[in-house]
Amino acid sequence: MASLGVNIDHIANIREARRTVEPDPVSMALLAELGGADGITVHLREDRRHIQDRDVELLRQTVRSRLNLEMASTEEMVAIALRIKPDMVTLVPERREEVTTEGGLDVAGQKASLSAMVQTLQAAGIPVSLFVDPEATQLQACKNTGACWVELHTGRYADADWSTQPQELARLQEGTAIAQQLGLRVNAGHGLTYQNVEPIAAIAGMEELNIGHTIVARSVAVGLQQAVRDMKVLVQNPRLDPLFGQAPG
């Protein structure tokens, strides 16, 4: 049964749109936990477009589930993680001009630098996950860095139409199986919604799904606690999917 990590970046996006103090991501994280979130995820970007350093500091003090810090693989971010000590760091690719993360890390192409960061963080007791596309070459490279976790990028699955989504689901199923064979633990996320999450949640070996935008969007209508509750039902009890005919796994 997969657990649910709630990404609260979009709460901070609303705040930063007016450069004001509300809504407060820290208090919203508490509501997400009250709604059943198994963890809280934030992405501290280099340009600080939404989550700010102070948010991460306060979340470390207040989160009672797990705090997953997404960040670029830079010396500045490693130093922040070593000071804050989140429950997990997820290294993600980052470009200032992107609206949101556009793809997985090229771990195979930067194995040496990523290995050094993984070793530094894990030596400090911080587990590291690498955000990658579900490709065998990248997964093997993740294993070679010494990381214990991967987060599979579900963006292509989320963006696919009905005719190609089954193939994208199959890529994620295969990627999960390969990762497990390598001894890696598997999370997934990006672009998942109430409409498409169940086939991913049903993949055998999937441990956690990190989901943000769709939960925050639904919270406008039903409140954050209820939006989290609604998503957790789907993540933990995925039904047979009519598009694919069976629960994947």
UniProtKB/Swiss-Prot annotation:
It is found in: Cytoplasm. The keyword Endoplasmic reticulum does not apply. One of its GO terms (cellular component) is cytosol. It catalyses: 3-amino-2-oxopropyl phosphate + 1-deoxy-D-xylulose 5-phosphate = pyridoxine 5'-phosphate + phosphate + 2 H2O + H(+). Its EC number is 2.6.99.2. 1-deoxy-D-xylulose 5-phosphate binds at residues 9-10, 45, 50, 100. Transmembrane segments: none annotated. SUPFAM superfamilies: Pyridoxine 5'-phosphate synthase (SSF63892). Coiled coil: none annotated. GO terms for molecular function: pyridoxine 5'-phosphate synthase activity. Keywords: Cytoplasm, Pyridoxine biosynthesis, Transferase. The active site is at residues 43, 70, 190. 3-amino-2-oxopropyl phosphate binds at residues 7, 18, 191, 212-213. It holds the Pfam family PdxJ. The record marks 151 as: Transition state stabilizer. It is an enzyme of class 2 (transferase). Homooctamer; tetramer of dimers. Belongs to the PNP synthase family. Catalyzes the complicated ring closure reaction between the two acyclic compounds 1-deoxy-D-xylulose-5-phosphate (DXP) and 3-amino-2-oxopropyl phosphate (1-amino-acetone-3-phosphate or AAP) to form pyridoxine 5'-phosphate (PNP) and inorganic phosphate. This is Pyridoxine 5'-phosphate synthase. It comes from Synechococcus sp. (strain CC9605). The lineage of its organism: Bacteria, Bacillati, Cyanobacteriota, Cyanophyceae, Synechococcales.
